[in-house]
C-alpha cells in the first residue's frame, strides 16, 4: 500500500507489501488473489464469456493446495505466509477473520463457476467451521465484543480485539 502517512516505515509515496515494521510480507494478499481469480471465473461464466484455461488452472490449483493444507493443519485455513523458504502455516490462537472469509468466498465462487477441484467442498466446510467457531457470542448483555469475529475477545478487560473489515470481508 502507499505509505502516505507512515513515514517511519519507509519513504512516502513508495509501495510495500510488508507489514508495518516487521520486514515480513502481509499475509492477506494470498486469499485476496484466490478470491479475485475465482470471482473472475464466476463473472465470466455468468456473462457467457470464455474462461481462460490459465484462470481455471490457477483457481483449481489454489483450491487443491488449500484442501491439502486444511487437512494437514487439523481443519484450519492458512493464516500466515512467511518469507520463503518457510512454508505457509496456521498459527494457533491467531484467527484472521478476513483471510478465512476470503478463502470461503473464493471457494464459493469457484463452486458457482463450475470448478470440480478435488477438495473444494472441504475447503468451504473448513472455512465455514472456523468462522462459526470464532464468532463471539457472550453471556454479557451489551458487551461490545458480542457478535464479532475475534482471536482475542478479552471479555473481562473490555480491551478485546476486533476489526470492522473482518466482518465486511466475511460477509
Which residues does each PLM region occupy?
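Extended ligand-binding clefts on enzyme/binding-domain cores
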Residues: 1-168
